[in-house]
């Protein structure tokens, strides 16, 4: 018998063929089970916000300032300063953010984990994080990796003479990779046009992606698919940066500002570079890209394969990027690694060498740098920045702050002494509470008025759901606070049933106005609070209709934002294209509806049991978009019963597709053939999928009605308060 056959761990957990191998199209619920307490090493009562507030941030920054110019032999600093490396580290931590679903970004320190830690575009950032380890070790739990990566980028800028806009802490670390769709390609940096291409038609990038190739943060610096065409590259830049919420001015400022510092690395052919961290040997201890070219570091370093230093001041803030961009004509050349780049024609050697003070080089640029000169819109902005350095500095400071804080959500989450006082439109500002809040007696009185207003349980519940369910746990945007459901663009979204919504809001506004007018001492109720309170009243009434007396928790303190405080274009990305909880699809999609339901549930930070009980409850409460009857498996309308589950699992019903695409199904009596119900893929998956059926069976059982109501109320309350960071 071979030694391998004798191995006692040959059949260890995790080995062998997986369910995913057998059934690759099986609905995957794993995204709903990540980041549980089982993967978190911190004590259950650990509160990162409290720990950060006690941190001596000035001391951390002093240590970071010292680190910038303390070059280590195992990874020497370019020009004697790590600033450029750390700016790239922070940029690439934040730069994965995308507006379509709010995923990516710096908020959880995901750069530490696969796949991001091994993306080609993040090559050698493992060294940057390892340089930071002594500081992280020193301050421990008081500063997360997520905050430290961004703070280090800020300090890098400040140490090189740049005045930043500010810094906010509050990014708590997670301890495992996020389940994010980064594309379908099976090869790093696969070019467009392949079988798994993210592009279609006239170079239309697949949603929700925001990078041009697998393993890149934004664009290919050599140009589209390596084609060194600055004008074509500008199209890619504009598309990808817009998908990260950056306009043309912010884009120019970020590229030019970031490329004022440091250099790229392409001393030799990429064939000299070893595997990325996740593929490297144990002895590398989490480091990757070990190079056999020369010393493998310093002047011999290979990262992107490009060998470019943009300015003669690579460790000092200046306007030299634009001076060089417009001061020379440029000719195409190749780096020592064979990558396309550009060199200034007939130029003197004025650019310092990163390691040899006796050497100088001609100015060099990337294809994507030249886009700032040869794209007409970018050129206009670039020339203004060239002529007005103060405007450039301010634009870069603001764009850098936006880049590094875009996924943090509202200002209520910002921590620390360097939070800027200025309120910015992209932060989705909401006025601070400036009046006494309603008390328990007021809550009871308002509920009674709402229930006597003529609005149905369905109208109350669906309106509150429409307001609250815009929340995204990814970038902490959306939610009921602000009452933006009454403003453009939310009031006009198809999923929100604009005509019904207008009726409900008008009724609630009349109740609010009457209540506020009768108060003394300045007490008021906001429409945002009243929308949620009305939904809670609807749930209580539905439970009563089912024979259960419950009190749905309610915490006042929401305020109403104005239209002027709402960026319509920015808010538009929150529009639900699919909301399985309302049985809503705006269009026909390649991705099955049940997959989109799980995606929505994950953005709402729901577990599989929470998703299950919530959907079953919303169906019987009549919360479907357009008053659709699909999935309303009950004869007791607007009563909070477990009928959805009971009737879905009833074996006297036979289900068959009602259309060729199997998006809608008919449930008929097995004996008579009479039509009993209709349902969508989202409805039937709770009887088809083995895990979801197991959950549905819990709520369909004879003893489950009370538990069902209790669990529904709990998850309803959770969703209504997802954006209430003031309650944390």
From Swiss-Prot:
Domain of life the protein comes from: Bacteria
The residues joined by the cross-link Tryptophyl-tyrosyl-methioninium (Trp-Tyr) (with M-244) are 91-218
Please provide, in alphabetical order, the Gene Ontology terms of the cellular component aspect for this entry.
Answer: cytosol
Stretch forming the signal peptide = none
Catalyses: H2O2 + AH2 = A + 2 H2O; 2 H2O2 = O2 + 2 H2O
Q: Where is this site: Transition state stabilizer?
A: 88
Ranges annotated as spanning the membrane: none
Annotated EC = 1.11.1.21
Give a short account of its post-translational modification. Answer: Formation of the three residue Trp-Tyr-Met cross-link is important for the catalase, but not the peroxidase activity of the enzyme.
Q: Keyword set for this entry?
A: Heme, Hydrogen peroxide, Iron, Metal-binding, Oxidoreductase, Peroxidase
Q: Which Gene3D superfamilies match?
A: 1.10.520.10, Peroxidase, domain 2
Q: What CDD domains does the annotation carry? A: catalase_peroxidase_1, catalase_peroxidase_2
Needed cofactors? heme b
The record's Pfam families line, in alphabetical order, gives: peroxidase
Top-level EC class: oxidoreductase
Q: What does this protein do?
A: Bifunctional enzyme with both catalase and broad-spectrum peroxidase activity.
Subunit composition and interactions: Homodimer or homotetramer.
Q: Which family does it belong to?
A: Belongs to the peroxidase family. Peroxidase/catalase subfamily.
Q: What is this protein called?
A: Catalase-peroxidase
Traced from the root, the source organism's taxonomic lineage reads: Bacteria, Pseudomonadati, Pseudomonadota, Betaproteobacteria, Burkholderiales
């Amino acid at each position: 018998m071979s030694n391998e056959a004798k191995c006692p761990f040959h059949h260890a957990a995790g080995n062998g063929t997986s369910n995913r191998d057998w059934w690759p199209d099986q609905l995957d619920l794993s995204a709903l089970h990540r980041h549980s307490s089982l993967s978190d090493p911190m004590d259950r009562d650990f509160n990162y916000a409290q720990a950060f507030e006690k941190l001596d941030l000035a001391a951390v920054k002093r240590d970071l300032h010292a680190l910038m110019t303390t070059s280590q032999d195992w990874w020497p600093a370019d020009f004697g300063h790590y600033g450029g490396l750390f700016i790239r580290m922070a940029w690439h931590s934040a730069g994965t953010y995308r507006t379509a679903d709010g995923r990516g970004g710096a908020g959880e320190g995901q750069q530490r984990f696969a796949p991001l830690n091994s993306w080609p575009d993040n090559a050698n950032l493992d060294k940057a994080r390892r340089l930071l380890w002594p500081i992280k070790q020193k301050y421990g739990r008081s500063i997360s990796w997520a905050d430290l990566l961004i703070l280090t980028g800020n300090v890098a800028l400040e140490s090189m003479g740049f005045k930043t806009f500010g810094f906010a802490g509050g990014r708590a670390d997670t301890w495992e990779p996020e389940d994010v769709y980064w594309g379908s390609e099976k090869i790093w940096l696969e070019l467009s046009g392949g079988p798994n291409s993210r592009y279609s038609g006239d170079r239309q990038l697949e949603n929700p992606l925001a990078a041009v190739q697998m393993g890149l943060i934004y664009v290919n610096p050599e140009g589209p698919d390596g084609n060194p065409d600055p004008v074509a590259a500008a199209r890619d830049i504009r598309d990808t940066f817009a998908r990260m919420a950056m306009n043309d001015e912010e884009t120019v400022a970020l590229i030019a500002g970031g490329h004022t510092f440091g250099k790229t690395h392409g001393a030799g052919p990429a064939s000299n570079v070893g595997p990325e961290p996740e593929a490297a040997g144990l002895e590398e201890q989490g480091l990757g890209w070990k190079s056999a070219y020369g010393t493998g570091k310093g002047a011999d370093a290979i990262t992107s394969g490009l060998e470019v230093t943009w300015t003669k001041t690579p460790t000092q803030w200046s306007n030299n990027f634009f001076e060089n961009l417009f001061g020379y004509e440029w000719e195409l050349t190749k780096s020592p690694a064979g990558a396309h780049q550009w060199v200034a024609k007939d130029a003197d050697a004025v650019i310092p060498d990163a390691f040899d003070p006796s050497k100088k080089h001609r100015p060099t640029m990337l294809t994507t740098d030249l886009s700032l000169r040869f794209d007409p819109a970018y050129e206009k902005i670039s020339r203004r920045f060239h002529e007005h350095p103060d405007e450039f500095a301010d634009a870069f400071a603001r764009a850098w702050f936006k880049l590094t804080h875009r996924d943090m959500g509202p200002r209520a989450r910002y921590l620390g002494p360097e939070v800027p006082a200025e309120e910015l439109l992209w932060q989705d500002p909401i006025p601070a509470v400036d009046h006494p809040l309603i008390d328990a007696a007021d809550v009871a009185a308002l509920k009674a008025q709402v229930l006597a207003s003529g609005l149905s349980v369905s109208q109350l519940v669906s309106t509150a759901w429409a307001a609250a369910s815009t929340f995204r746990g990814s970038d902490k945007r959306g939610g009921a606070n602000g009452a933006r459901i009454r403003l453009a663009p939310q009031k006009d979204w198809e999923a929100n049933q604009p005509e019904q919504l207008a009726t409900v809001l008008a009724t609630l506004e009349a109740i609010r106005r009457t209540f506020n007018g009768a108060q003394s001492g300045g007490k008021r109720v906001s429409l945002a609070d009243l929308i949620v309170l009305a939904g809670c009243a609807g749930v209580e009434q539905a439970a009563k209709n089912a024979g259960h007396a419950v009190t749905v928790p309610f915490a006042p303190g929401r305020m109403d934002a104005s239209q002027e405080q709402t960026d319509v274009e920015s808010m538009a990305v929150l529009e639900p294209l699919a909301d399985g909880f309302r049985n809503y699809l705006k269009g026909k999609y390649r991705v099955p509806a049940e997959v989109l339901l799980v995606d929505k549930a994950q953005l709402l930070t729901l577990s599989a049991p929470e998703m299950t009980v919530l959907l079953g409850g919303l169906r019987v409460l009549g919360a479907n978009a357009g008053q659709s009857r699909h999935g309303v498996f009950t004869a007791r309308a607007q009563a909070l019963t477990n009928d959805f589950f009971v009737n879905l699992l009833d074996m006297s019903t036979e289900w068959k597709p009602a259309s060729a695409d199997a998006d809608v199904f008919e449930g008929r009596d097995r004996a008579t053939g009479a039509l009993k119900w209709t349902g969508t893929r989202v409805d039937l998956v709770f009887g088809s999928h083995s895990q979801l059926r197991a959950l549905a069976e819990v709520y369909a059982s004879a003893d489950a009605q009370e538990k069902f109501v209790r669990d529904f109320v709990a998850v309803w309350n959770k969703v209504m308060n997802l954006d209430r960071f003031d309650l944390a």
